[in-house]
Amino acid sequence: MYNLKDMTLEEMEEFFVNIGESRYRAKQIYKWIYGKKVTDFDQMTDISKNLRSKLKEIAYVSQLKIEERRVSEIDDTVKYLFLLEDGNIIEGVAIKYRFGNTACVSTQVGCNMRCSFCASAIGGKVRDLKASEMVDQVMAIDSDYGKISNIVLMGSGEPFDNYDEVMKFIKIVNNPHGLGIGSRHITISTCGIVPKIYQFADEKLQVNLSISLHAPNDELRTQLMPINKAYPLEELMKACKYYVDKTRRRITFEYSLIEGVNDKKEHAYQLVDLLKGMLCHINLIPINYVREIGFKKANNEKVMMFKRIIEDAGISCTVRRELGSDIEAACGQLRRKYLKER
C-alpha cells in the first residue's frame, strides 16, 4: 500500500500517470490531504467513485496518534508523544512565539550521534523517519495546537543522517499545494555532518541552517560530541563558510551553556575567535537538566557574561528563553520516561 503523504507533488503526479489517471489528480488529492486535512477517500467528493475505489485498494493517507500530551503551566508549550504505525514512539513540541506557532519535529526514532548532554542519544537510533511521519507530526500539532507557521527540525534525531527523507519532507510542507510553509520559516539543525552541509548548500534552498556547536575548541567538543572526531572544527568551519558564500544566508550556531564545562570566560573568547568574520548568529541555550546525564545549566550571571563578550566582539547573540521546563521538554526526555513506564 502506498502512503500518499510520502509523495512530493511531482511523485504523486507520476503515481497517477502510472495507474492510468490524469496528472492533475495529484493537485486535487494534495488539496484534500493538506488543505482540508481529509484522510478518507470517500470524503473526497470531487473524485470519481471509480478512482476512489481504486485508491482504497492501493493507497492510504496516514495519521499520527497522539499517545500523550503535556501542557506547560509556565508558557503554553505542549509536548507530544506520537505512536507510529510500527509501535515506535517519537516526540514533537508546539511552541508559541509572538510571530506565530512553531512545531519542533523529530527526524529519527532515537539518535546515533551520542552527544553527551542529550537525552535523545540514550539508547541510540532505532530507525529513520519517513517524510510522511515528519509531515504527520506537523499536521497533528497544527490540528491540536493551532495553525503552525514555523517548523524547526530540532527534535530527536540528526536531520542530515536522514538527508533524503528530510529533503522530501521540506518539499512537501513548502509546496503551496501542500502545507505552504515558506522556506524561510523552516530551520534544520545539524550537529555537523560536514559532507551534508556542502550538499545542503548546493540545494540552494532558502531554508535556515543551524549548527549545534556547544564548544569552541576540538578537545572540549570531542568530549561533548563524538561527531567532532570525524569532522573537527576546522573542517566544520570550512563547510559553514562554503554554505554562507554559496547561499548568502546567515548560519545560527547553537551553544548550550553547561555549568563548569563550557561556560568559562576563556570559552567565550575562543568562540569569538572561531566565528568572527562569519555571517552568523549565536543562540545561547541554558541547558535542560536531564536526570540520567547530570549536567546542570550555567547560572544567569555566566550566561550574561558570555553574551556580553560575544556582543562586544560585534557578533549577533541571543539567549533562548526556557520553554516547557516543567514538562521535561528536553529532547528525548518524555519518550524515555514513557518507555520506562510502559
UniProtKB/Swiss-Prot annotation:
GO BP annotations, alphabetical order: rRNA base methylation; tRNA methylation
Swiss-Prot/TrEMBL keywords: 4Fe-4S, Cytoplasm, Disulfide bond, Iron, Iron-sulfur, Metal-binding, Methyltransferase, rRNA processing, S-adenosyl-L-methionine, Transferase, tRNA processing
Active site, UniProt feature: E91 (proton acceptor), C331 (s-methylcysteine intermediate)
Domain Radical SAM core as annotated: residue spans: 97-326
Subcellular localization(s) per the UniProt record: Cytoplasm
GO molecular function, one term: rRNA binding
GO cellular component: cytoplasm
Residues the entry annotates as binding [4Fe-4S] cluster: C111, C115, C118
UniProt catalytic activity: adenosine(2503) in 23S rRNA + 2 reduced [2Fe-2S]-[ferredoxin] + 2 S-adenosyl-L-methionine = 2-methyladenosine(2503) in 23S rRNA + 5'-deoxyadenosine + L-methionine + 2 oxidized [2Fe-2S]-[ferredoxin] + S-adenosyl-L-homocysteine; adenosine(37) in tRNA + 2 reduced [2Fe-2S]-[ferredoxin] + 2 S-adenosyl-L-methionine = 2-methyladenosine(37) in tRNA + 5'-deoxyadenosine + L-methionine + 2 oxidized [2Fe-2S]-[ferredoxin] + S-adenosyl-L-homocysteine
Disulfide cross-links: C104-C331
Its job: Specifically methylates position 2 of adenine 2503 in 23S rRNA and position 2 of adenine 37 in tRNAs.
The name this protein goes by in its record: Probable dual-specificity RNA methyltransferase RlmN
Natural source organism: Thermoanaerobacter pseudethanolicus (strain ATCC 33223 / 39E)
